[in-house]
Amino acid sequence: KLAQKDVFLNIAGGLKVNDPAIDLAVISSILSSNMDTAIEPEVCMAGEIGLSGEIRPVNRIEQRIGEAEKLGFKRFILPKYNMQGLNTKKIKMELIPVRKVEEAFRALFG
């Protein structure tokens, strides 16, 4: 049970931790560790998580997707709201839009 464990998070140097877009990645890594199930290495994600589990939109989503593609990621989990106005024609990676944390976890862990 996660409530009975201590959680430590190691953030790589140079990463901005005051950016709410990191919320989805942090909670996904904690769940991955608790379940002892790895997140596929080609998956990237960005999203702010609200108190009720909704995935809120983040700024600069096109820039984030572009950088993820340059780094070799194949799948990107993002807030569904960020799909509005997104030029998907130039994006080669698979985009997985989600509204709730549960949807993101299904995309990650089946």
Residue positions per predicted region:
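Peripheral, non-AAA+ core regions of ATP-driven protein-machinery
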Residues: 1-110
